[in-house]
Design a protein with these regions (language model features):
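Active-site neighborhood of HAD-like aspartate-dependent phosphohydrolases
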Residues: 1-16, 30-35
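Conserved H-loop
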Residues: 7, 97-102, 126-127, 169
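Helix-loop "lid/cap" segments that line or gate small-molecule binding pockets
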Residues: 21-35, 91-92, 119-122
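Short, acidic loop-to-helix structural element flanking the phosphoryl-transfer center
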Residues: 51-79, 85-89
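A short, structured active-site edge motif that brings together acidic residues
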Residues: 98-112
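Short acidic-hydrophobic, aromatic-tinged amphipathic segments that line or gate anion-handling sites
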Residues: 105, 170-174
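Conserved Lys-Pro-Asp/Glu-containing loop-to-beta segment of HAD-superfamily phosphomonoesterases
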Residues: 113-141
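Acidic, Mg2+-coordinating phosphoryl-transfer loop and its flanking beta/alpha structural elements
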Residues: 132-171
Length: 187
């Protein structure tokens, strides 16, 4: 933000805004009323994210093993993220997880989670058997909108109050709890 003349903000201000689109994040953080200014901030963020920001991601302890077991048990895994698809794929590849996922759906400035899920459903996703697993209320709300079950997780960027308030079908406090929720292999 500083490189475009905006005041730098503390991580504590950014963290609660992670999840919705970058346009929402920057409209909240920057004193900028114009769409053009927001788009410049988004472009600058993506420039840095594409060069090094993606590599700053970290895996949560136990997630690779949980994902591997879910996949081995016949669950079809997908990613529905606010990140652009190319960034999400690069992150999955960086961690050696890309082969576990059937699809990656990415967001954009004008594409939110609800729109992403609507597109996935129109492309054949069965909402009656799908489960959205997410760390933010926006994930749970998007699932509710489309009649998809949801599991809120308490690791990541959301917190207990936010997740509980969004009313997911289940709440997991640790990654391996997902294996308890989805213990039966898919036939």
């Amino acid at each position: 933000m500083e490189s475009l003349g905006y005041e730098t903000v503390a991580e504590e201000q950014v963290r609660p805004l992670i999840g919705p689109s970058l346009a929402v994040l920057f409209s909240e953080l920057a004193d900028c009323a114009s769409d053009e200014g927001i788009l410049r901030l988004v472009d600058k963020f993506r420039e840095r994210y594409g060069s090094i920001g993606y590599s700053e991601n970290r895996l949560y302890e136990g997630m690779p093993e949980v994902l591997t077991e879910l996949s081995a048990n016949g669950y079809l895994l997908g990613v529905c993220t606010g990140k652009r698809v190319d960034f999400a794929v690069r992150i999955l590849e960086m961690f050696g997880l890309s082969d576990l996922f059937e699809f990656v759906s990415g967001g954009d400035v004008d594409i939110d989670k609800k729109m992403q899920i609507a597109t996935l459903i129109s492309n054949g996703l069965d909402a009656t058997t799908a489960v959205m697993i997410g760390d933010r209320a926006v994930d749970v709300h998007a699932a509710h909108t489309h009649g998809i079950a949801s599991t809120g997780v308490l690791w990541g960027f959301g917190d207990r109050a936010e997740i509980k308030e969004s009313a997911p079908n289940h709440v997991a406090t640790r990654p391996w709890e997902l294996l308890e929720l989805f213990r039966d292999p898919v036939e």
